[in-house]
Amino acid sequence: EEDDDDLDEVDDIEDAEAHAQDLAQLAEKDPEFYKYLQENDQELLHFGQGEDEEEEEDEEKEEEEDERLLTMDMLQQWQKSLLRHRSPRALRRLLLAFRSVLSSHDDVVQHAFHVQDSRVFSKLIITTLKYMPMVMEYHVPYKKTADGRFKVQTHTQKWHILHRPVRSYFMSVIKLLQTLPEADMVYVALNESAKMVPYLHQDRRVARDYVRALLGQWSSGKDRIRLAAFSCLYVTTASALDDDMVDFCLKSTYHTLIRNTCNTKPHTLEHIALMKNTACELFTLHADASYQQAFGFIRQLAISLRNCLKLKTQEQFQTVLQWPYLHCLDFWSLVLAKTCHVDREQGVPSHMRPLIYPLVQVSLGVGRLVPMSRYFPLRLHVIESMLRLIQATHVYVPLAPLIIEVLESAEFQRRGKGATLKPLDLETTFRAPAAYVRTRIYADQLLSLIHISEP
């Protein structure tokens, strides 16, 4: 648990770095932030040059007199100091207040500040999220390398002083993402914290906690939040400094995806598709790590299928005949279709191409696992995944036997009985109810889906 002393050292570089902020340069260098000031803090663009540190001293006295009650005037004074001087002293106070309001319900923690006005609360959150990247980039600039990583000068005195505030910032952002219900505020937190990712990887434990918080937002909420969370996750994975962090990001993302496929219903299908399509992007970033993770997970699928065929117990069948397993097959077909796409390879085989054969073997085995007509929807799901792989990679997959067995089954060889049943939602069905067997409506739906699936 942190205490206020963690942020004390930031005062040490205040005097050396104080200078007037050139707003014209700010508008040119960071137009997005300048636009934010124009729209939300117009008064900060017109503060007088005669204002000096005496105002800050007055604020300190007010803080003591009011028992550190945070007011809008105090917050605006901090904003001015951050804009004019990139003031580490003002940054320290801002982060203390940020941490205090986010842990206000924790009676064990001694709070440096407290807030009574909801407007001040919102302003504090937005100010911290918006100003922190600006101040850090000024004091500890970074460079982006060709491989997508960030090079931060971690051997400087400034970083030695500011690395604890960075840790405090991310711990507060993590708490915000886990507890704040306002979607708009969460969206801002995701977008702004992404700008701080270059400084994140210096603390592995905090980086992992941040990834977990991102995955929580990626797997729930509205699409806008999901996409913003994934954008942060993508940058975090791409810029990871070591293989352990890359593996953690890939594994955690995959496990989060699979957990969210258990409840495959019409109203969840769109979200699952979004998660699969975005998670697929992570496996295009680091070739070696992606191959190792994909190899391990496809091997697990193969072992589950082998145990099912060998032991033939109900428990083993249930391991394979469930939505998470089918979504795993579909996800890896997405990954391999993307990483091994002929247009992407341009004559140079992808490092992932050797995984196509084992995935195809497992998929075909699952497709023929249960020959009963009730499981034809499962077979058609497998066929759809394999067709995607065929079209992208131009590999040969013997799908004809799977399709012919369906067409030669009793569902089509006998005249189907009429029924007043509603059409099945085959996208969210892998086993048809017994009432649909030998019915005209079921046969028509299967035939329609086979026709659509033909390349």
Predicted regions and their residues:
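Charge-rich, low-complexity intrinsically disordered regions
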Residues: 1-269, 273-377, 381, 389-455
